[in-house]
Swiss-Prot record:
Name of this protein: 3-deoxy-manno-octulosonate cytidylyltransferase
Keyword Zinc: no
InterPro entries xrefs: Cytidylyl_trans, KdsB, Nucleotide-diphossugar_trans
Compartmental location: Cytoplasm
Reactions this protein catalyses: 3-deoxy-alpha-D-manno-oct-2-ulosonate + CTP = CMP-3-deoxy-beta-D-manno-octulosonate + diphosphate
Pfam families, sorted: CTP_transf_3
Pathway: Nucleotide-sugar biosynthesis; CMP-3-deoxy-D-manno-octulosonate biosynthesis; CMP-3-deoxy-D-manno-octulosonate from 3-deoxy-D-manno-octulosonate and CTP: step 1/1; Bacterial outer membrane biogenesis; lipopolysaccharide biosynthesis
Keywords: Cytoplasm, Lipopolysaccharide biosynthesis, Nucleotidyltransferase, Transferase
GO terms, molecular function: 3-deoxy-manno-octulosonate cytidylyltransferase activity
EC numbers, comma separated: 2.7.7.38
Amino acid sequence: MSDPLVLIPARLAATRLPNKPLADIAGEAMIVHVWRRAVEAGIGPVVVATDTAEIARTVEAAGGLAVMTRADHPSGSDRLAEALEIVDPEGRHDVVVNVQGDLPTIDPAIIGAAIVPLADRTVDIVTLCAPITDPHEADNPNVVKLVGHAVGPGRLRALYFTRARAPWGDGPLWHHIGLYAYRRTALSRFVALPPGELEVREKLEQLRALEAGMRIDAAIVDDLPLGVDTPADLERARALLQGRRLN
């Protein structure tokens, strides 16, 4: 692992919260807050990948770098792969970190945590998880659960991802956080694969990698970043970031 690249896919076509990346939070667009958190992680260059000129202009006005991608990508991973080839056609970056564009309050430290397990050459992809502490989350299908076993301090090997409560019995349940660090070769392989049977059934793209025999490990973090999906989430993010600004 030599020189990671951080990519933030962003597009306007959100159903529950229209124009989400451009929503104002404490005087700046949400996508700018995400870009700033990724820069603060200090692991490598940060680029926003978008199919919307207004998003690109907003990021660039804040001092960031954005690239335009096609509008017809079936998934964020495909957008990621196109952006990687635009930004780094020479292949200098051998790791790409995918930070979702709706995490304006994310702790930069957990972005950095995602690349650590890639020191193990048998790992293809790394993601994050946090312990489920709210019993209502265990049965909530909107909370994706990671099923895995420990392979070291603060690290799990993912065996499955599901919207159901799993695994059964006593023990921790893990809330999956949709941030990924890919080896470049793994990302290329992943986007070339057809959708998997379990991926389609659970509506979870990461299952495609497991079905194909790729290894996904997860770094355990203490806190869940706030994902902004609804107007209520947006108000929570505004309160949090306005409070930080006042402090």
